[in-house]
């Protein structure tokens, strides 16, 4: 008789599985055999309030060996020059701290293991949690913007050729005819159709009166003829 499977599938086959933080070599890299001790305590764990770990991010094209000192200001950014290139130093500690609190940080410190044959994630001595950087600085090259003579670069504005015979009938929002000096012309144009319509009404009324008069005269003539005919009979 077959057995029924479990109602759910667990994430791991065994609850006693031990997750190792041992660092594996990425593709394209070689294993380094001359690892040295990292300046933490004997277990590669940070001693509280006695040591600080700083992360300083440099551009890949900067030769760090030429750097004798690093000007740091915790209140604002600073600048320095290496090989005639200017660089800006920014304190990103607050940004990294907020990312760490939201579990969004991807920064971890790798230190040599006790055997010096592999790397592992550095942890704190208190709760064995991954070690966080006390300070994070980013170094980026600043661009030099050359001086621009705008009087030579600026191109004079050319007006669009005007077409003669056009009439302005619509105005932009916030403007009226007076702003374009066409108030009188527009008013005259508006009055003309009213005059024409009134004149047309007069012509139509006179034609109606004329037709009514003609009908009345025809009716009177017909009545007179009918009376004469009756009188003869």
Swiss-Prot record:
It is found in: Nucleus, Nucleolus. Keywords: DNA-directed RNA polymerase, Nucleus, Phosphoprotein, Ribosome biogenesis, Transcription. Residues 179-191 have a biased composition (Basic and acidic residues). Transmembrane segments: none annotated. Residues 179-233 are annotated as: Disordered. GO terms for molecular function: DNA-directed RNA polymerase activity. One of its GO terms (biological process) is transcription by RNA polymerase I. The keyword ATP-binding does not apply. It comes from the Eukaryota. The keyword Thylakoid does not apply. Residues 208-233 have a biased composition (Basic residues). InterPro entries: DNA-dir_RNA_pol1_su_RPA34 (IPR013240), Euk_RPA34_RNAP_subunit (IPR053263). GO terms for cellular component: nucleolus; nucleus; RNA polymerase I complex. The modification Phosphoserine is found at residues 10, 12, 14, 60. Belongs to the eukaryotic RPA34 RNA polymerase subunit family. PANTHER family: ACR243WP, DNA-DIRECTED RNA POLYMERASE I SUBUNIT RPA34.5-DOMAIN-CONTAINING PROTEIN. Present with 3360 molecules/cell in log phase SD medium. Component of the RNA polymerase I (Pol I) complex consisting of 14 subunits: RPA135, RPA190, RPC40, RPA14, RPB5, RPO26, RPA43, RPB8, RPA12, RPB10, RPC19, RPC10, RPA49 and RPA34. The complex is composed of a horseshoe-shaped core containing ten subunits (RPA135, RPA190, RPB5, RPO26, RPB8, RPB10, RPC10, RPA12, RPC19 and RPC40) where RPA135 and RPA190 form the DNA-binding cleft. Outside of the core, RPA14 and RPA43 form the stalk that mediates interactions with transcription initiation factors and newly synthesized RNA. DNA-dependent RNA polymerases catalyze the transcription of DNA into RNA using the four ribonucleoside triphosphates as substrates. Component of RNA polymerase I (Pol I) which synthesizes ribosomal RNA precursors. Besides, RNA polymerase I has intrinsic RNA cleavage activity. The heterodimer formed by RPA34 and RPA49 stimulates transcript elongation by Pol I. This is DNA-directed RNA polymerase I subunit RPA34. It comes from Saccharomyces cerevisiae (strain ATCC 204508 / S288c).
């Amino acid at each position: 008789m077959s057995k029924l499977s479990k109602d759910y599938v667990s994430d791991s086959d065994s609850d006693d599985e031990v997750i190792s933080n041992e660092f594996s070599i990425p593709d394209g890299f070689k294993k380094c055999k001359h690892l040295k001790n990292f300046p933490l305590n004997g277990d590669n764990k940070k001693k509280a309030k006695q040591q600080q770990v700083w992360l300083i991010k440099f551009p890949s094209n900067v030769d760090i060996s030429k750097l004798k000192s690093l000007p740091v200001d915790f209140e604002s950014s600073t600048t320095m020059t290496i090989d005639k290139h200017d660089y800006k130093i920014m304190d990103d500690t607050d940004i990294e701290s907020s990312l760490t609190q939201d579990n969004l940080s991807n920064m971890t410190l790798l230190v040599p293991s006790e055997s010096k044959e592999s790397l592992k994630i550095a942890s704190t001595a208190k709760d064995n949690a991954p070690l966080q950087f006390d300070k994070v600085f980013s170094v980026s090259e600043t661009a030099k913007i050359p001086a621009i003579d705008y009087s030579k670069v600026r191109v004079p504005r050319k007006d669009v050729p005007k077409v003669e015979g056009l009439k302005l009938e619509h105005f932009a929002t916030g403007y009226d005819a007076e702003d374009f000096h066409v108030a009188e012309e527009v008013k005259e144009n508006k009055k003309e159709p009213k005059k024409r319509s009134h004149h047309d009404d007069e012509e139509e009324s006179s034609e109606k009166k004329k037709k009514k008069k003609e009908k009345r005269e025809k009716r009177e003539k017909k009545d007179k003829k009918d009376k004469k005919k009756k009188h003869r009979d």
